[in-house]
């Protein structure tokens, strides 16, 4: 049975967090100039093995539509301005000119609505990012290291593993605020005869969007189902490449008042692990259940924006 919503006393101990941070650190593991962090765990064989998971040749987007509407989950709707190019810019004779249109986008994608990837430079601690790089914006108004462009050079292709909590628990959704611990993951592995391993993209479905459909909005910054920060130890031991969730992977509340996104900090700063937030995993869940599967080929390629702390993203499952 999954852990209840109540936190044990030790969850609030900052000392546990600090000790774990030191224990799991990947700083220097792949060299002092490494820019990829746990993406180094994805080998050629990981990609080749992921191909074998394509049985039906079907694809599913794991992204939500980017919303233009403000709501309690979306504090920053995308601003989208379409335009038609003036005729005099499309040909020497405006009467015979081609017709074309374009767009201007403005988006603040970090938050609780837009599906996005957190690049490794999204979080710092004491002025340092993963591998000791300075957590600072340079004179060119960009981070010099660990930007999403580094992830975009190779993209992310590997085996995807879906921990589908509602299916495992036999419910429509897992109540917001439920904490998932290492022992819960291992119970899921045992039941499904799957071992999460090196190079995997580990996705957690909580049923967030189904809870929204049935019960409406709630204050997500105070209650969100996700991993307890100690799961970072599991991610390190298993050499997981990337984590993602229909929430933000972190459980809210984290149990540490000064660390709202405790797992985010451990994953990004200590492990050097990119994170996928606000995914739509519902259709994937239905199709994998139909096939009695939990794994698939995962593909994602973020925008290559120099030094950016992440980007909107449209991951794809191929099965």
Regions found by a protein language model. Name each.
Residues 6-319:
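Active-/binding-site microenvironments in catalytic and ligand-binding cores
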């Amino acid at each position: 049975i999954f852990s209840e919503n109540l936190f044990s006393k030790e969850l609030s101990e900052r000392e546990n967090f600090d000790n774990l941070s030191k224990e799991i650190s990947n700083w220097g593991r792949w060299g002092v100039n490494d820019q990829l962090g746990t993406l180094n765990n994805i080998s050629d064989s990981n990609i080749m093995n992921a191909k074998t998971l394509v049985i039906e040749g079907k694809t599913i987007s794991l992204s939500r539509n980017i919303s233009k509407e403000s709501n309690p989950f979306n504090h920053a709707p995308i601003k989208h301005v379409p335009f038609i190019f003036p005729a005099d810019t499309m040909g020497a004779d405006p009467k015979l000119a081609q017709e074309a249109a374009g767009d201007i986008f403005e988006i603040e994608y970090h938050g609780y609505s837009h599906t996005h990837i957190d690049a490794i430079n999204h979080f710092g601690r004491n002025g340092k990012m993963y591998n000791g790089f300075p957590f600072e914006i340079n004179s060119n108004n960009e981070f010099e290291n660990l930007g999403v462009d580094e992830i975009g050079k190779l993209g992310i292709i590997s085996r995807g593993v879906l921990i589908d909590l509602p299916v495992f628990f036999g419910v429509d959704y897992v109540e917001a605020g439920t904490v998932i611990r290492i022992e819960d993951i291992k119970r899921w592995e045992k039941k499904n005869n799957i071992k999460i391993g090196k190079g995997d993209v580990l996705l957690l479905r909580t049923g967030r969007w189904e809870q929204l459909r049935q019960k409406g909005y709630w204050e997500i910054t105070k209650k969100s189902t996700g991993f307890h920060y100690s799961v970072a130890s599991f991610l390190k031991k298993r050499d997981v490449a990337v984590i993602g969730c229909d929430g933000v992977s972190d459980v809210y509340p984290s149990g540490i008042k000064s660390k709202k996104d405790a797992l985010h900090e451990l994953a990004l700063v200590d492990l050097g692990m990119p994170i996928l937030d606000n995914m739509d995993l519902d259709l994937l869940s239905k199709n994998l259940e139909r096939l009695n599967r939990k794994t698939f080929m995962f593909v994602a390629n973020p925008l290559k924006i120099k030094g950016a702390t992440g980007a909107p993203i449209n991951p794809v499952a191929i099965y």
